[in-house]
Structure formats: structure tokens, C-alpha cells
């Protein structure tokens, strides 16, 4: 059989019809007039959200029957200006009912007659002076100046300290200047020799590192009753001494290195001295020390005596080696100061005072090839006597030295 070919058959012309696409927003009257080039088939409704879900005023199609609101139909409220507020000048003045000046002003108005001036030219240039002020004579230069800046506590303490010498009757300008910084505090307080000695001991204790309770001393010195008792007790013991002994003590203190500001009487008061301009080095010769036992009364106690008492009872006692063991010979220079001269060469090797006790056994490394690495701080004795050279007088070695040397050799073995 022959295969049948498919054929396309077109209907006749009278059966053909024309199909047009239009937008739903367009009115039906405009469908036929517009060109169909831009028209497309509508997409499926499932891809677009429904317009019914949109709130009013957020787009969406307007129906033809919906009425549009005109702005002219909206009623408008006429704006009226507010009432103008007029401020009264009397409102700006505070009455001050609780002020005390109100009563004074009312009494003044009742006492003074009211005056009326017809014109501005008749008004006096100056106000009326109150009756209680007319008879008073006040000078504006004597008005007390009130400082605006706050005054610090340190400034008050410094001012009060500077006022002490003037209150006690001692002129500060007449006293000689003090070169030592440690005794500078003692010249600013108007007290007796006991207080001066205590202050010098406090200043020395700061440098020496002693255990003196400075707060207790300050409390004692700040209490005037305790100070009077101390001065009375000490004054009874030193009342026998005369002015000559005080002058002698001041000269001896300068020789010992203690600087005194002014001579001290038996009452514990200071006497002003004339200003010292320049004294030559050999202006006076000090008294011989053998003249001191001639006085029947005991010598006046200086600041060093009280300083030693405080160091013995209030803190650690720091002993200083005597002068004769230092190997120095003191010769007074023309200026009065000591002139140290070396008289013993062995003092160059002098070791400082050991704080720990040494062991009596000799050090086995001393004077050996290895040597002692501790040096002067070694706990054992460094005795060089067994190694002294031969005696030049008889050419022999001491037998005791030989025995000591043998013992040290056995100890090393």
C-alpha cells in the first residue's frame, strides 16, 4: 500500500475570523483604534500577586466607577494669630518678701519725706546721704582686702613659722647665718636649749637612720605644758651657771664643730647679737682647756649632750671610734679648722668595722697562691704576722712565728 501523506487543509475565506488582543485597563472603545504591535498575550495570573491584597492608596487598578476626591472639596481651617502677650515691667522686678532689706527700705521710706521734682534739671546729681553715715569718717584705703584665691595649708604653716622669731623678741636679721643644713630648723623656733637640742637630734636621726620616734617628739614639743616642765626641770640644774659659762660654752662648741646661733642665758632665753660683717681668722684665741676645772659650777650642757641622750634611750646607739685611734694629728689652721696629717701609714689598710663576729680560726686561703675571694668580708681571721720578713737587727726569725707558720701548714694539709 502506498503511504498516505498528511495534508493541511485551510478553511474557506468566509469561515476565517480575526482575533485581537487588548489590555484590561483600556476601555473597550479604544481597543480598535490603537495599533496591535505592542500588544502581547497576558501572562498567567499565578505569577503576579493579586491586587486585592494591596491596601488602598498603594497602587492597584482604579475602576472606572470609582469617584476621585478633589482638593477643593476638602474643608480648610482658617488660621488665626494668637493674642499678643504684653510683658509688664513690674514683672521683671523681684519683690523679695523674705529679704531683710525690705524692712529696712520700708523704715527708710517712713523716715524720709517723699520729694517731688518738677523736672529732670531739678534732680540732684548725688543721692541723699543717710543720717547714720553723715557723722562717720571712713577711709577707703583701710578697707580689708578679701583674697579670692584659696590659701593652701602649706602657706599658712610657712607664715606661722616665720612669725615665731618676731614674737619672741629676737631679730632675725641680727643673727648670724647658719651654714649647716641640719641646724637650720633650730634657728626658727623660739624655745629653750632643750627644744633646740631635740630638734637637732631629730634632724640628725634622719641622716643616721636611727629608730627615734619622731612623732612622739613632735607631740611633746607641740604641747606647751610639757615643754615648760622640761625647761623648768633642766633650768633648776643649770641655774648656777653664769653668763661667762654660756659664752665659754658657745666658743667651745664652735671648736668642736657645733654651730650656735646666739648665746643662751640660764633662763633659756635668746639675746640678740649685733650683725657680724667679717671677722679675721686670728681675731681671738680660744681659752685653754685646763681653765675649765677652775669653775665650781658644772659646765652648761650643749646640744650634743641631749643628742647623745636621745640616741642612748630612744634609738640605736652608733658608736664612733675615738679620734686618737684614727692615726691623724690635728693642727689648728689660721681659719680655725682642723688640718689632718697622716702619721701612720698602716691606716691606709684599715678595714671598716665588721657587723658580724669573726671566727678565731685563721683563713686557709689567705696569703696563698689561690687567695681568699672574700677579702675583708671573710669570716675567718686574716693574720699576716707569720709571714713577716726576717728581723734586720739580729738576722733571725722569731721562734713563735715559726711555730704559728707550722701550725697553719698542718691545718692546710
UniProtKB/Swiss-Prot annotation:
Write out the biased-composition intervals (Polar residues): 176-189, 389-403
Which stretches are zinc fingers (C3H1-type)? Answer: 357-385
Under what name is this protein listed? Zinc finger CCCH domain-containing protein 6
- Tell me what organism the protein belongs to: Arabidopsis thaliana
Q: Could you give a GO molecular-function term held by this entry? A: zinc ion binding
Keyword Methyltransferase attached: no
Organism's domain of life? Eukaryota
Q: Please name the PROSITE patterns in this protein's record.
A: ZF_C3H1
